[in-house]
């Protein structure tokens, strides 16, 4: 059994961003992700420009991913009627494949450990979490972040 400072369960946007943030502050971080990287996710991603200062603080160069600038929103009905709205603050669109891979590589450059495996059990006892994966990895930590998404069965 290996003791870790911080364990993050889930290597999506929340998990990887948390890993980058904590590693920037000097913490030792281990991320457990059930899928391999790079990974496809059937969705696009809109990110508001209001988060740019935070992304800059994390030393993320999102411009290197060639995001699409988004300044308006348009809804349409099945009959073709539309409603349009300007987005004063604006934002950008980027593929999850590209963004997840970028965050994954940044977390590794920051010194994070990424383990591929699915969490099978979480036990909290004596102020410590014991995490067991389906491939028999057992880790312990006083700090665990659950970033496994809303559809997880954990």
Where are these regions (language model features)?
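Glycine-rich FAD pyrophosphate-binding loop
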Residues: 23-43
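Short phosphate-binding/catalytic loops that engage adenosine nucleotides
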Residues: 27, 60, 112
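Beta1/beta-strand and adjacent pyrophosphate-binding region of the FAD-binding site
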Residues: 1-14
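Small-residue (primarily alanine) positions within well-ordered alpha-helices
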Residues: 14, 18-19, 23, 107
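Short, well-ordered alpha-helix to beta-strand connector turns
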Residues: 4, 26, 141-142
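A conserved beta-strand/loop capping segment in the N-terminal third of enzymes
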Residues: 51-104, 124
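Conserved N-terminal glycine-rich FAD pyrophosphate-binding loop of Rossmann-like flavoproteins
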Residues: 36-58
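Predominantly flavin-linked oxidoreductase catalytic cores and closely associated redox partners
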Residues: 106-154
């Amino acid at each position: 059994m290996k003791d870790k400072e911080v364990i993050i369960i889930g290597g999506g946007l929340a998990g990887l961003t948390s890993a980058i943030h904590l590693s920037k502050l000097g913490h030792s971080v281990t991320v457990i992700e059930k899928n391999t990287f790079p990974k496809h996710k059937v969705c696009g991603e809109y990110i508001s420009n209001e988060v740019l200062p935070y992304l800059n603080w994390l030393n993320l160069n999102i411009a290197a991913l060639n995001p699409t600038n988004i300044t308006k929103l348009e809804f349409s009905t099945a009959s073709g009627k539309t409603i349009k709205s300007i987005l004063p603050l604006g934002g950008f669109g980027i593929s999850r494949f590209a963004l997840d891979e970028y965050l994954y590589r940044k977390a590794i450059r920051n010194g994070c450990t990424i383990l591929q495996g699915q969490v099978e059990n979480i036990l909290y006892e004596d102020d410590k979490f014991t995490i067991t994966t389906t491939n028999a990895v057992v880790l312990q930590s006083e700090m665990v972040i659950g970033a496994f998404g809303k559809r997880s069965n954990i």
